[in-house]
């Protein structure tokens, strides 16, 4: 997705779990990885990188009159990125039998209360949701898989139409802010 979309990615994990757990992992064969890789996009990426044979100036100082023009020029890349990520999630799903989406819903199909979260809290929330639904509650969880760029339409598609209340669990605390980043995105959506 990063190479085809021409936008850098940050993959983040919950540090405590990563440093305190032992888990088995499945490693893909190189042939499987090759199927996932768009070699035309890789070639375009390599042709665009810095090269002494094709000198170019990047990262130079800009004044305000040109900075915002360049800043706005990259919007098209970010706007196209969710569809590219969905395309690759589809390829991974087909290969591994998973069901990754930008926003995955878990819980009662007629949930009245829904949690929206990302990260390891989702595993704990699933256990609680199973318990509560088994005892007559109607609750669910939306797991955020791609946080930025945030696709409000995909979030709304993931929330059951029966939902009356939403709780956003955010791992960030920004003192003095009106709300945390994920919460503000959900409210805006």
Describe each model-derived feature in a short phrase.
Residues 6-7, 137:
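Residue-level recognition of short, well-ordered coil/turn positions
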Residues 8-104:
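Conformationally flexible catalytic loops at phosphate/diphosphate-handling active centers
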């Amino acid at each position: 997705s990063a190479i085809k979309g021409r936008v850098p990615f940050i993959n983040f994990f919950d540090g405590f779990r990563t440093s305190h757990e032992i888990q088995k992992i499945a490693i893909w064969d190189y042939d499987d990885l090759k199927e996932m890789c768009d070699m035309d996009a890789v070639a375009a990426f390599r042709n665009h990188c810095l090269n002494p044979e094709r000198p170019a100036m990047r990262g130079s100082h800009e004044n305000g009159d040109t900075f915002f023009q360049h800043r706005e020029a990259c919007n098209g890349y970010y706007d196209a990125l969710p569809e590219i990520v969905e395309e690759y999630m589809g390829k991974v799903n087909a290969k591994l039998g998973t069901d990754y989406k930008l926003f995955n819903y878990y819980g009662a199909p007629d949930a009245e209360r829904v949690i929206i979260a990302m990260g390891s809290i989702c595993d704990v929330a699933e256990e609680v949701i199973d318990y509560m639904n088994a005892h007559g509650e109607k609750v669910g969880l939306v797991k955020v898989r791609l946080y930025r760029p945030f696709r409000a339409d995909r979030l709304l598609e993931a929330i059951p139409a029966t939902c009356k209340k939403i709780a956003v669990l955010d791992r960030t605390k920004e003192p003095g802010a009106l709300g945390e980043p994920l919460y503000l995105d959900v409210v805006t959506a």
